[in-house]
């Protein structure tokens, strides 16, 4: 008997989780308030880090681990960072195999570039639209699973609440944003992959659809939470009309500097750090 997983959120995390669950024998119901093509993940520009060592710099997952902990200033979970850095290279290669159009060198190796806080070039990228390329490949893969009957997608459905019996979650309720119909999903597990909370802020480079309402409902239900203060801000933007457009971290990774004025004088200068301190 197959287990059923409901995933709330169909961006990079939700799609990846769906494919992983199917690979491990689960069936998946994939719920999202918008189509995957409009997820925040599509907007990611810069790249994805892994110690692939295609530049002959003698890079390694251990160095990736050390750089990441250093850049985190003691706030990162060492066990989580170790797992991520050990798995990163194989994950990036599997994404390339899945169809992500990463930049490659003349020798047909994955190209790598600098990002902030790392000693070696270890950022794989797809021109300036890495997120879009990642999402395109993952969406295609999930649609193949949908055709096979292992994934059922529910775009334009909003999460409303969990179905709880004491401390046991037995499913969730979602609502069709067009018809208002409520659907009750009974399942073996619910995975929340709804992204950040930046839609709460007046000025953001992210999608305004990321309102944080799912997190708020989970908080109301008493679901244990951690690291809610870890909201990333992006220091390079261009203001166009009412929306802040993101300038990739790659601009700083290649040596670009950021100057902010206070009383007409530069007071903040962020430069690419070739050796984390």
Where would I find each of the regions flagged by the language model?
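Glycine-rich FAD pyrophosphate-binding loop
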Residues: 23-44
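N-terminal Rossmann-like FAD-binding beta1-loop-alpha1 element of flavoenzymes
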Residues: 5-30
